[in-house]
Amino acid sequence: MNKKFTDEAWDDYQYWVETDKKYLKRINQLIKDIDRNPCEGIGKPEPLKANLHGYWSRRIDKVHRIVYTVENKQIVYISFRFHYDK
């Protein structure tokens, strides 16, 4: 699938590139897994509810999540830092 990063997601990704290679490795593993199957796999995929209906999250760790959606065979990454209710 094609990948698209929102400006916030790209800034978050660059933050991990510059600050923590361990987190970056985990994020890259999750991105690979999301590409294979957006709704199943590692990181406890969870469909979000209420005002985030249509979005999914995966755990990077206890604090940080990847938030993304799938639109027309394209994965759109929304964020890579913090929790989705920030």
Where are the regions a protein language model picked out?
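Enriched for short, Lys/Arg-rich terminal
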Residues: 2-4, 11-24, 49, 56-65, ...
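Non-catalytic effector/regulatory segments
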Residues: 9-10, 38
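PIN-domain endoribonuclease scaffold, especially VapC-family toxins
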Residues: 24-32
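A short, surface-exposed loop/turn module that caps and links secondary-structure elements
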Residues: 32-59
